[in-house]
Every structure is written in C-alpha cells, then in structure tokens.
C-alpha cells in the first residue's frame, strides 16, 4: 500500500472541503485512490457515536450479516438489506487497481459473500430496540435499495429492480420476485443500486454508480451509469433522469418543495483534498460533470476532453468533503 502515499498529506483543514463553496486545490494525480483503512470494530459497552444536539444514538439491532441499507415501512417495521457485491462475471479483467481494492475492502470487513437477503426488524413496544429480527425476503441478488409503492415492495438488486406483493404487518414473503426493469450490471464497479419511489408511487428512481473512477474502461461501459434512472413500475420503461453523478446513493424528497435530493460519491486519484463528495437537489435532465469535470466546470484532464459536456455541467449545492464516502440522506420532519 506504499503507492497510496504518492499523493502526500492533505494540505487543507477538514472543513475546507465542506459547504456551498469548498476550496478546490490544484489536482495531484496518483496511481491509486487515497486510502486510510480503519479497522472494523464494534462499540464497547456503554459507548456510542456522539450525535448532534437534540438527537441520540442507541443500538437498535445487532447480529446482522453485512447490513448495508435500511427502509422503514409505514407500520414502523424496519427492513435491512444484508448484502455485498456480486461475484464479477468471468469475462471481466481484473488488474492492480482491483487487487488493491479487494485488499482494502477485506481489511475493512467487506470481503465476505453476499447474504442476499432482507431482514425485518420490529420494535413493537417502541423502546428503541428491535425485539423481532427475522428473515423477510431471501434469494435476492446483492439487494440494496427498497421502496414501497401501493401494495408492492420494490427492491433494487445489483442487476434489476424486482417487486413482491406486500401487506402491512407481514413478517415474511415467500413468493418469487417479479422482474420490473433491468439495471446496468456487468463489471459493477459500483454495484449498489439505491431506490426511492415518487410520493404518488407512479415512478421509481434508481441511483446507478459508474463502472470506473473516471471512465478508464471506456464509455461503452458507462451506458446509463453515473446517473439517476426514472422507471415506470407499470411497464418497466426507464429513462435517464439526471447524469454525470459518479455514484449517487442516498436519495430523499424535500418536504419543503418536493425536489429530489441525492448524496454523491465523487472520484479519486487526484489528491487527498479532491474531489469533494456532495449532496444536491437534482435538476431533471441535469448533467453534473462526471467524468469530464467536477464541482461544476472544473476540468478533469484524465478523460478525453469534451468541452461541450463541461459547458453543461451543473454545480452541486453542498460539498461534504473529499473521500468521505457520504451515503445516506434523509430529511427530518420531526
């Protein structure tokens, strides 16, 4: 991992990469991403993360196998996707970068087979601890995002959106999921597929990450990737709702104006202080720069140039710091 030191130490204070106008130092290209591997350990007894004023943190459930995403059903039950990346197809070539990433992920506790299931957690007495933990839906394919629309529960697998019938209070679903729409798969550099339904349930929105850092495998590998896709759940038809978002993960609807917001993981290998991850309101049809530019129209020199695309790039709303891997996003309505 000595190659990771080629970028040198960070030159900016941590808060310089946050806010509506983050500092953007000159890029310093490196061979592999900036990494600092934290050991995967639990919280000791009596300890917990420190929350912002007015909020608290406590353990809701434990003993889960690689939990990655949560979804709260209207009756208060919580679904958790126990999941990991799918096995890559044998046709996918894997080089030094992939080898390093596998080692990094394994050390961080992520080098395990995917459990491929959704587990239900229920806190019936409302004491902040789930007393029921039970398998809810199994036999999936690296599931991640979940969304309820009407009487159907939609799940974003690594390669498709699927659906099952749902009735309030169910603790297990045994029917075979119905395929609603295919999703970009293949190499699956970013395999997680986040999912939200429109407030009226008539459309689904899927966050699909890029298949690379900055398009190094060719743009043929990036069709309908680095984008939010809009899907008609009745027909399975899909279109690109917004693009140029390297890895759009957490999504939520603003209760104030109804706009869709997203948290985005940006690119690597141009220094510790670049590029800031961000959250932003999503402009329908908007293009957010990837891979040709970042934070609006700051040109990334690594991909083949495309000035016309750079000129279209929308500047995001709020930076969240470089390499923070910002994932979840939720509006508080309390």
Report the location of each language-model feature:
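Conserved beta-strand position repeated once per blade in WD40 beta-propeller domains
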Residues: 66-69, 145, 194, 250, ...
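Short loop/turn segments immediately following beta-strands, especially the blade-tip
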Residues: 121-126, 164-172, 282-289
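C-terminal motif of bacterial Sec signal peptides marking the signal peptidase cleavage site
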Residues: 3-5
């Amino acid at each position: 991992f000595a190659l990771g030191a080629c970028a040198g130490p960070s030159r900016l204070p941590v808060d310089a990469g946050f806010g509506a106008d983050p500092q953007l130092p000159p890029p310093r290209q490196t061979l592999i991403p900036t990494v600092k591997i934290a050991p995967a350990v639990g919280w000791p007894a009596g300890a917990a993360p420190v929350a912002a004023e007015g909020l608290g943190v406590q353990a809701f459930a434990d003993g889960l196998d690689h939990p990655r995403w949560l979804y709260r059903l209207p009756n208060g039950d919580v679904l958790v996707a126990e999941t990991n990346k799918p096995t890559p197809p044998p046709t996918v070539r894997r080089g030094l970068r992939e080898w390093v990433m596998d080692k990094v992920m394994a050390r961080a506790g992520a080098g395990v087979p995917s459990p491929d299931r959704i587990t239900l957690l229920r806190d019936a007495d409302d004491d902040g601890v789930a007393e029921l933990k039970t398998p809810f839906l199994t036999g999936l394919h690296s599931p991640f995002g979940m969304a309820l629309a009407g009487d159907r529960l939609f799940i974003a697998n690594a390669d498709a959106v699927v659906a099952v019938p749902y009735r309030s209070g169910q603790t297990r679903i045994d029917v075979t999921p119905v395929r609603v729409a295919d999703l970009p798969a293949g190499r699956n550099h970013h395999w997680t597929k986040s999912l939200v339904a429109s407030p009226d349930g008539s459309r689904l929105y899927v966050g699909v990450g890029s298949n690379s850092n900055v398009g190094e495998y060719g743009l043929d590998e990036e069709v309908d990737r680095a984008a939010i896709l809009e899907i008609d759940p009745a027909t399975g038809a899909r279109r690109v709702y917004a693009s140029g978002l390297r890895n759009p993960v957490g999504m939520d609807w603003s209760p104030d104006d109804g706009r869709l917001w997203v948290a985005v993981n940006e690119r690597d290998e141009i220094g510790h202080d670049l590029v800031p991850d961000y959250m932003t309101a999503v402009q329908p049809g908007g293009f957010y720069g990837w891979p040709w530019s970042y934070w609006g129209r700051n040109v990334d020199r690594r991909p083949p140039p495309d000035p016309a695309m750079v000129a279209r790039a929308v500047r995001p709303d709020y930076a969240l710091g470089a390499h923070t891997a910002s994932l979840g996003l939720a509006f508080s309505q309390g």
